[in-house]
């Protein structure tokens, strides 16, 4: 009976020891043949007995990755601690079981059949405990692997965070560098705009000056035309008055008085009787004057440029180089008549030689201007080839086209002047031929009229030797009209004279 009571007490203690770790693990383990029991239906969740501590805060919004990782790690650590406590309790229970088995061996040795049965039961319980221990160790290994994996994940996340921060810093630096570059470009653009504004203002001032100079040149050209027209009118009026006066004198005065006056007066020259000398004006032979290509005619500090300016004034018959009488545009005949109180006498009209000289001077100036234009054409072509930008190239091409148009106009002027020179030469040759024919006729008539008296012969010879008093003036007037017509044709509005 005592043995039976001892066995019952030992069995109850053994069942209590086995029940404690099973309760801590959250499952009911009974002393039966199967080690596991069905999960109780009154606990639908695994952690229904879990109570949250008030110190631990709860978050209504989803946690971030780092916080979720830390919370998972804490849960794993809690589980590991609980498993370790369970393992310790299991070891303690194993120790107690080993002690009890030693105590029970004495009793079991006495009872062999009961001992065999107890041995079988103990072996079964030991196998169950070893299996539980192996399962706990496997769980611990898995948890350790999970911890290592989580540590690696945390390291990888930190490395990614540092790389992202470095990329942000590099992007910020690049953005600052781009901002500085853009600022420099904007400053350069501001400087270029200021320079462009300066150039536009300078160009506007230069255009205004050019317009003023062109207006002055037009005024001077108009004044020169008016003076030429006035001079032509005065010359024609004086010539008509002289012819009327000579006709009246020849009709009123008898022949005897005229013969006596001729005998008493000394012999005078043909041109000195009725004409005054031409106004003293500085005439320049343009063929002897040099032309320096590429030099400006405006006044400058350079000696060569000043010489070029003086040559330009001399070629254009500037009033600066003339005396006061010429500048005041008063004819010499009027000054002489005012001083002496004599009757009005006109100046001689320009001869064919003076017209030829003026035409040669005009032709020389036109050729010089054409040479200057050709030199400018070469310079513009070089600049177009060396131009760095397209806008500058287009502007230079426009200037080149305008220069080509002016060169064509200048070439037309040169051809017109040359044609007029050729016409004058033809007229001169025709006049010489007519004069030769007239002299031959006079010689034939003198041979036939040898019976005439000496006085009548001398008068006839003089009359035949010199032309009629109206013919020479008519020829000179015709030459003057031709010269004025060619000047008007050359100074038309369709053409521009470049000085």
UniProtKB/Swiss-Prot annotation:
centrosome localization domain (CLD) as annotated region, ranges: 58-239
Subcellular location: Nucleus; Cytoplasm; Cytoplasm, Cytoskeleton, Microtubule organizing center, Centrosome
Any GO molecular function: fibroblast growth factor binding
Sites of Phosphoserine modification: 53
TM segment ranges: none
Pfam families: Cep57_CLD (PF14073), Cep57_MT_bd (PF06657)
Name the UniProt record assigns to this protein: Centrosomal protein of 57 kDa
Species of origin: Bos taurus (Bovine)
Lineage of producing organism: Eukaryota, Metazoa, Chordata, Craniata, Vertebrata
